[in-house]
C-alpha cells in the first residue's frame, strides 16, 4: 500500500486522463484502417451503381486514381492482399476470393512500397481509357477492400477483449474504454470523397482518348485533388497541430490549463498518435496520385516546348527535380517510420504528462506535419506551374521552330530566368530582414520605455519627501539626500498668481471620520496629536510621486522652450507659509518680485543653478489635510512660487528672496486610546476589548503588491496630462488641473481616497 501511494504521489499524470500503451496503438491502427476501407467500399459501390444506371453513356471509371486515393498501410494486413493491390494499380487483374487468415492482433507494417507505374504514355493511355478493364478493376477493388475490412473487424473485437482483460482498473473497479469517438475528426478519410467524381464521359473516341487528351485531363484531376486536400484533409490536422504547439510552449500550471481545453484531452496522446498516423497516410496518398499523373506525362513535362511556355524556367526546373525526388524515393520518411516503431514497444506505457506530450510532439506530430506540409506545397506548385503552362500554350508561339532552336532558346531562357529568380529571392530576404529589424526596433523601444517608466516609479526612496522625515528634520537644515537635485520640486508660473481682487471658488468635500475640523493651522496641528487615524505613509508616497512627475514635466518643458545653445537661467525659490487671509500689500510685493525675475537673462552658470536647486524645498503646507472652506470673496489657495527667466527678456538685479518657514506636520502614527474613548466596563461579566482589536490587521502580501501597483498606475496617469494647457500656464501643478481644482486640493483628495480605502 505504501509503495502504491508513493507511486501515485510521484506521478504527475492528469486526473481522469487515459495513458497510451502498445494495445491502444494497435487499436488506433485498426480503427484508422477500418475507416479508410469502409469509405473505399462506399466509393466503389457508388461508382459501379452510376455505371449501371447510365449504361447508355460512354462513362469510364478512373479506377487507377481511386486505388491511389485508397492506398496506404491498411492493405498490409496480409501479404496476399498487398500483392493484389499492387496488381490492380498496374491495370492487371487478380483474384477476388476471400483470404483465410488466422486471427491475430499483431501491429501493422507502416511502410508502403512504391507500386510500379507504366512510363510508356501510349500503353498507359490505352489502358486508362479501356472501359471494360477499368470497370473490372473497380469491382475487384471493392471485393478486396471488403475482405480486408472483415479481417480488421475480427481483429478489433479480439483486441478490445484483450485490452479490457489486461488493462488495470480505476478506483471504481472499471476499465477505461477505448473511445473511438475521440479520434473521429482526425481519422476521417476525406480524400476518398474526391473519388466520387472520377467518372469520365467520352464523346469522341478518336480525340478524347489520345495522349494529348490525357495530358489535358490530368490537370483538372490534379486541381480537384489539390482543392480536396486543402479544404477537407489538411485542416483537421493543422488545427490540432496548432493546439498542441501552443501547449508545448507553456510550462507549469498554465500548461495544465491549456491541456484541459483541448478536445478529448483525456486521450491527448492517442489523438497525437492518430494525427501523426493520418498525416503519414496522406503523404502516401499524395505520392500515389502524383505518380499516376506525373510518370505517364513525364516526357511532356520535360519537353522543350513545355519549358519555353513556363513562367520561370528556373523555378520550373526545380519543381521537376522535387517531383523526381518525391515520386521515386522515400528517404524523407525513414526517420518518421523509426519514430512510429519506437512507440510500438510492447511493455511501454505513456502517461498524459507534459514530458510525454512534448516528446510525442517533437518526434511524431511535428515531423509528420512538416512532411505533409512539404507534400501539399509540392502539389500546389505543380498545379500552379502546370496551369500557367497550359494558358501559355494556347498562343502556340513555338510551333514553327525546329528542335535545335528550341533547345538553344530553352538554355537562354533558363539563364535569364535564373537571374530573375535570384533577384526575387534577394528582394524577399531583404524585405524579410527589414521587417525583422523594424519589429525588433519597435520591441526595443517599447521595452526601453517600459523600463524607464518602471524605474521612475519604483526607484524612489521613501525617505526623500515622506512626511515622517519632514516632521523629524529641522526646519533650517536638511540632509544631502533630501537636498539632492533629483528631489522633486513643484513648479508654478508667476503669471498664474491671482490677485486678491479676483475670487476663486473651492470645491468642498466630505469630511473624514478620522480628521477634525479646526479654524486655523495651529489648531489643526495640535488637535491631531490625540486623534485616531490611519497612517498617511502610503499617501505621502503618492504625493511624492505626483510632485516628482510635475517637476520632471516642468523641467522638460523649460528645456524645450530655451533652445539648445542657451544656458539655464537663475531659479529663485520663494517658499511662503500658508496664510489664511493674505493682505493686499503682500500680494503686490509678490507680483513685483515675479515681474523682476521674469526679466532675467541667461547670465548664470550651471553650478549656480545647481546650488539653487539644492536650496529648493517642498512646502509642507501641501501635505496638510486642510478642511477650510474658503469664502468666494478675496480667498486664495496657498501657492509655492518658483520664478523662471524668459529667453527674450533682459536681466535685473532687483531679485529678493524670502526666508521660508517650514512647519512640522505630525504623521508619526496613532496614539493609544484615552480613558474617555475606551472606559472600563462597569457591568458584571464584561471585559475591556484588547487594544489590538482597535487597529486593522497588517495587510497580506498580495494586498501590498496590489496597492503598490495602484500607486504606480496613479502616478502614470498623472504623467500623461498635457504640460501646456494655456498660453499663460507654462508648467506647474495648476497647469495640470482645471481652474476650480488646485494642486493642494488634488493632493488632499488623493490622500483621503487612500485613507477611506
From Swiss-Prot:
Residues 522-541, 569-590 have a biased composition (Polar residues). Disulfide bonds: none annotated. Residues 427-541, 558-590 are annotated as: Disordered. Keywords: Cytoplasm. Residues 427-437 have a biased composition (Basic and acidic residues). InterPro entries: GIP4. It is found in: Cytoplasm. Signal peptide: none annotated. Residues 501-510 have a biased composition (Basic residues). GO terms for cellular component: cytoplasm. It comes from the Eukaryota. One of its GO terms (molecular function) is protein phosphatase 1 binding. Residues 438-477, 511-521 have a biased composition (Low complexity). The keyword Cytoplasm applies. Belongs to the GIP4 family. GLC7 phosphatase-regulatory protein involved in GLC7 subcellular redistribution and chromosome segregation. This is GLC7-interacting protein 4.
Amino acid at each position: 500500500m505504501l509503495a502504491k501511494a508513493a507511486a501515485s504521489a510521484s506521478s504527475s499524470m492528469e486526473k481522469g486522463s487515459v495513458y497510451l500503451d502498445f494495445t491502444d496503438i494497435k487499436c488506433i491502427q485498426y480503427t484508422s484502417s477500418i475507416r479508410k476501407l469502409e469509405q473505399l467500399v462506399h466509393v466503389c459501390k457508388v461508382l459501379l451503381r452510376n455505371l449501371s444506371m447510365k449504361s447508355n453513356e460512354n462513362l469510364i471509371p478512373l479506377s487507377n486514381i481511386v486505388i491511389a486515393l485508397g492506398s496506404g498501410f491498411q492493405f498490409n494486413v496480409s501479404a496476399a492482399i498487398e500483392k493484389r493491390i499492387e496488381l490492380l494499380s498496374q491495370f492487371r487483374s487478380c483474384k477476388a476470393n476471400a483470404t483465410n487468415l488466422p486471427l491475430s492482433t499483431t501491429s501493422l507494417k507502416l511502410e508502403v512500397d512504391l507500386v510500379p507505374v507504366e512510363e510508356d504514355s501510349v500503353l498507359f493511355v490505352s489502358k486508362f481509357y479501356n472501359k471494360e478493364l477499368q470497370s473490372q478493376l473497380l469491382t475487384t477493388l471493392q471485393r478486396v477492400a471488403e475482405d480486408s475490412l472483415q479481417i480488421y473487424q475480427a481483429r478489433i473485437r479480439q483486441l478490445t477483449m484483450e485490452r479490457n482483460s489486461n488493462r488495470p482498473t480505476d478506483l471504481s473497479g472499471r476499465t477505461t474504454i477505448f473511445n473511438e469517438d475521440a479520434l473521429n475528426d482526425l481519422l476521417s478519410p476525406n480524400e476518398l470523397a474526391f473519388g466520387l467524381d472520377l467518372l469520365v464521359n467520352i464523346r469522341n473516341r478518336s480525340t478524347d482518348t489520345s495522349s494529348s487528351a490525357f495530358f489535358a485531363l490530368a490537370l483538372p484531376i490534379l486541381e480537384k485533388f489539390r482543392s480536396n486536400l486543402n479544404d477537407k484533409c489538411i485542416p483537421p490536422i493543422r488545427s490540432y497541430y496548432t493546439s498542441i504547439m501552443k501547449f508545448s510552449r507553456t510550462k507549469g500550471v498554465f500548461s495544465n490549463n491549456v491541456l484541459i481545453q483541448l478536445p478529448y484531452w483525456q486521450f491527448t496522446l492517442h489523438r497525437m498518435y492518430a494525427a501523426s498516423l493520418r498525416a503519414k497516410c496522406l503523404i502516401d496518398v499524395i505520392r500515389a496520385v502524383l505518380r499516376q499523373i506525373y510518370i505517364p506525362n513525364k516526357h511532356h513535362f520535360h519537353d522543350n516546348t513545355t519549358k519555353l511556355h513556363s513562367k520561370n524556367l528556373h523555378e520550373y526546373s526545380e519543381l521537376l527535380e522535387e517531383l523526381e525526388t518525391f515520386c521515386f524515393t522515400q528517404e524523407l520518411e525513414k526517420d518518421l517510420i523509426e519514430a512510429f516503431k519506437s512507440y510500438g514497444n510492447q511493455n511501454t506505457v505513456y502517461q498524459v504528462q507534459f514530458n510525454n506530450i512534448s516528446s510525442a510532439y517533437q518526434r511524431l506530430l511535428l515531423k509528420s506535419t512538416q512532411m505533409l506540409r512539404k507534400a501539399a506545397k509540392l502539389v500546389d506548385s505543380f498545379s500552379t506551374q502546370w496551369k500557367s503552362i497550359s494558358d501559355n500554350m494556347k498562343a502556340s508561339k513555338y510551333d514553327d521552330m525546329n528542335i535545335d532552336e528550341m533547345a538553344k532558346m530553352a538554355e537562354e531562357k533558363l539563364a535569364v530566368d535564373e537571374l530573375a529568380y535570384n533577384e526575387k529571392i534577394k528582394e524577399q530576404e531583404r524585405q524579410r530582414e527589414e521587417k525583422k529589424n523594424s519589429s525588433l526596433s519597435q520591441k526595443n523601444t517599447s521595452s526601453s520605455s517600459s523600463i524607464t517608466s518602471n524605474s521612475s516609479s519604483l526607484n524612489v526612496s521613501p525617505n526623500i519627501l515622506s512626511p515622517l522625515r519632514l516632521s523629524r528634520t529641522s526646519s533650517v537644515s536638511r540632509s544631502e539626500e533630501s537636498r539632492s537635485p533629483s528631489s522633486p520640486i513643484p513648479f508654478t508660473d508667476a503669471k498664474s498668481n491671482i490677485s486678491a481682487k479676483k475670487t476663486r471658488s473651492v470645491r468642498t468635500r466630505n469630511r473624514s471620520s478620522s480628521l477634525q475640523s479646526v479654524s486655523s493651522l495651529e489648531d489643526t496641528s495640535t488637535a491631531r496629536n490625540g486623534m485616531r487615524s490611519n497612517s498617511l505613509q502610503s499617501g505621502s508616497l503618492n504625493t511624492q510621486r505626483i510632485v516628482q512627475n510635475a517637476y520632471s514635466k516642468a523641467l522638460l518643458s523649460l528645456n524645450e522652450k530655451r533652445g539648445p545653445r542657451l544656458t539655464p537661467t537663475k531659479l529663485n525659490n520663494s517658499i511662503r507659509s500658508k496664510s489664511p487671509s493674505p493682505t493686499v500689500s503682500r500680494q503686490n510685493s509678490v507680483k513685483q518680485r515675479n515681474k523682476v525675475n521674469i526679466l532675467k537673462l541667461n547670465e548664470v552658470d550651471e553650478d549656480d543653478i545647481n546650488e539653487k536647486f539644492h536650496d529648493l524645498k517642498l512646502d509642507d503646507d501641501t501635505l496638510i489635510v486642510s478642511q477650510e472652506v474658503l469664502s468666494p470673496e478675496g480667498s486664495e489657495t496657498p501657492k509655492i512660487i518658483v520664478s523662471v527667466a524668459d529667453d527674450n527678456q533682459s536681466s535685473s538685479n532687483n531679485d529678493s528672496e524670502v526666508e521660508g518657514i517650514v512647519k512640522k506636520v505630525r504623521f508619526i502614527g496613532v496614539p493609544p486610546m484615552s480613558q474617555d474613548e475606551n472606559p472600563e466596563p462597569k457591568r458584571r461579566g464584561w471585559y475591556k476589548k484588547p487594544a489590538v482589536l482597535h487597529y486593522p490587521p497588517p495587510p497580506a502580501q498580495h494586498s501590498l503588491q496590489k496597492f503598490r501597483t495602484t500607486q504606480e498606475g496613479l502616478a502614470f496617469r498623472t504623467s500623461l496630462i498635457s504640460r501646456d494647457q494655456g498660453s499663460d500656464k507654462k508648467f506647474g501643478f495648476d497647469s495640470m488641473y482645471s481652474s476650480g481644482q488646485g494642486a493642494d486640493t488634488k493632493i488632499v483628495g488623493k490622500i483621503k481616497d487612500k485613507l477611506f480605502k
